[in-house]
From Swiss-Prot:
Its biological purpose: Nucleotidase that shows phosphatase activity on nucleoside 5'-monophosphates.
HAMAP family: SurE (MF_00060)
Entry binding sites for a divalent metal cation: 8-9, 39, 91
Example of a GO cellular component annotation carried by this entry: cytoplasm
Disulfide cysteine pairs (residue numbers): none
Protein name: 5'-nucleotidase SurE
Keywords, in A-Z order: Cytoplasm, Hydrolase, Metal-binding, Nucleotide-binding
Gene: surE
Catalytic function, reaction form: a ribonucleoside 5'-phosphate + H2O = a ribonucleoside + phosphate
Family according to the record: Belongs to the SurE nucleotidase family.
CC cofactor: a divalent metal cation
InterPro entries: SurE (IPR030048), SurE-like_Pase/nucleotidase (IPR002828), SurE-like_sf (IPR036523)
Record's cofactor remark: Binds 1 divalent metal cation per subunit.
Gene3D superfamilies in alphabetical order: Survival protein SurE-like phosphatase/nucleotidase
Length: 249
């Protein structure tokens, strides 16, 4: 089996190397990852310039594009053999609740939804790599069992791992996405020459993080697995919209 590995932290990220090392003796793994950190890139595709793959000394392929670019090229002609599945991560930082809308890690997995196998996005709840070995172990264990899964086509599994040693993990829970409140306002700042700019600020506080959510699971020491689908249609809104549209045309 052939696995395409991507991420959004960049080709030099320790989480990417940890994921590759965890899977390299299980399948034929190829890494295509952004040359620079592309956190928050979501599902952006680069359309205004050409993309140039670069072979790295460790055998990884770096790309001057987004995480989605990496998977798009990796599945569509960049590689000699088309990968059978896509695994993304390991992200240093959580991708919980609304985070999945912005996450390049999750977006890379979403771009891998057409392979016929589940795509995985792995995230560790820390900006530091101290417990990457825990997330790598979980990634290997889950990917190894993927052929026993019976899921609808184009399912993406977002996996968040608590920042704990493996023997402190309490188990694994299936979860739904929680929700955050509105993000904190951007921070206005002037550079040394007096030109003002803005920094995107931190995510909002947890607003919906009760039992059953991804937030709750990881805070209790459990690995959270949230199945995602591309269809974001809000069907409960149909009734209100139908009455609103009466007599418009």
């Amino acid at each position: 089996m052939r696995i395409l590995i991507a991420n959004d932290d960049g080709v030099y990220a320790p989480g990417l190397a940890a994921l590759y090392d965890a899977l390299a003796d299980y399948a034929e793994c190829t890494v295509v990852a952004p040359i620079q950190d592309m956190s928050g890139a979501s599902s952006a595709l680069t359309l205004d310039r050409p993309l140039h793959p670069v072979s790295m000394p460790n055998g990884f392929i770096g790309l001057n594009g987004s995480p989605t670019d990496c998977v798009h090229l990796g599945l569509n002609g960049l590689l000699e053999h088309t990968p059978d599945m896509v695994v993304s991560g390991i992200n240093l930082g959580a991708n919980l609740g609304d985070d999945v809308l912005y996450s390049g890690t999750v977006a890379a997995a979403i771009e891998g939804r057409f392979t016929g196998r589940p795509a995985f996005a792995f995230s560790l709840l820390s900006r530091l790599p101290d417990n990457l070995s825990t997330a790598a172990y979980i990634a290997r264990a889950l990917v190894e069992k993927h052929d026993r899964l019976e899921l609808p086509p184009r399912t993406v599994l977002s996996v968040n791992v608590p920042n704990l040693p493996l023997d402190h993990i309490r188990g694994i829970q299936l979860t739904r996405l929680g929700h955050r409140s509105r993000a904190k306002p951007p921070v206005k700042q002037a550079n040394p020459r007096g030109k003002e700019g803005y920094w995107i600020s931190v995510a909002g506080d947890v607003e919906d993080g009760g039992p059953g959510t991804d937030f709750h699971a990881v805070m209790q020491g459990y690995v959270s697995i949230t199945p995602l689908q591309l269809d974001r249609t809000f069907r409960e809104a149909f009734d209100g919209l139908e009455s609103w549209l009466e007599n418009v045309l």
